[in-house]
């Protein structure tokens, strides 16, 4: 680097030469090329607990440890059946939206909260269904709806895990689970 001792030093900010420094230009420079995830706001801007948000983030990316994921990673021979209905494969989509028990919980929850939302059907995927239902709400109501969705999928996951790890066949029925979720939401 050659320096000219006869000229005065000057300060400039390469991200935005018109100004000396701005946090906004630094942020933009650091995030250049960052991937935009359209569903991130659904999760991270909700009122749900952090552990529930983290679970939802993993669930929509199919990164929760269901038996199909363990089988894909060679941790078990083959996927096992859903621990709730014993009919379909134990995977994230089935546990959270496609299982008969999950549908009953969604229906009960929406009725209890008087929410006008469609219950997921057999072909729905969590993220697609969630984004479609979310689009029906006003800007202010979306945050509340997102919180309800996250709370319900967290409760369904906890019910599934109680059966898997506690080896119990007892589970809360849909009204009991919905009541439990509503109680947690009020806290």
Q: Which ranges hold each PLM region?
A:
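Charged boundary/loop elements
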Residues: 1-187
């Amino acid at each position: 680097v050659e320096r000219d001792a006869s000229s005065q030093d000057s300060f400039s900010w390469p991200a935005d030469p018109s100004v000396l420094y701005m946090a906004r230009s630094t942020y933009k420079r650091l995030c250049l090329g960052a991937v935009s995830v359209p569903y991130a706001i659904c999760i991270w801007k909700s009122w749900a607990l952090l552990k529930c948000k983290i679970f939802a983030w993993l669930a929509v990316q199919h990164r929760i440890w269901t038996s199909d994921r363990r089988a894909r990673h060679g941790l078990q021979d083959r996927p096992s059946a859903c621990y709730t209905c014993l009919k379909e494969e134990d995977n994230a989509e089935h546990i959270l939206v496609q299982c008969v028990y999950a549908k009953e919980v969604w229906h009960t929850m929406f009725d209890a909260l008087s929410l006008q939302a469609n219950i997921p059907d057999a072909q729905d995927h969590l993220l697609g269904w969630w984004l479609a239902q979310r689009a029906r709400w006003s800007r202010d109501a979306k945050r509340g709806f997102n919180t309800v969705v996250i709370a319900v999928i967290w409760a369904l996951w906890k019910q599934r895990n109680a059966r898997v790890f506690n080896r119990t066949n007892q589970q809360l029925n849909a009204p009991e689970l919905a009541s439990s979720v509503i109680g947690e939401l009020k806290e």
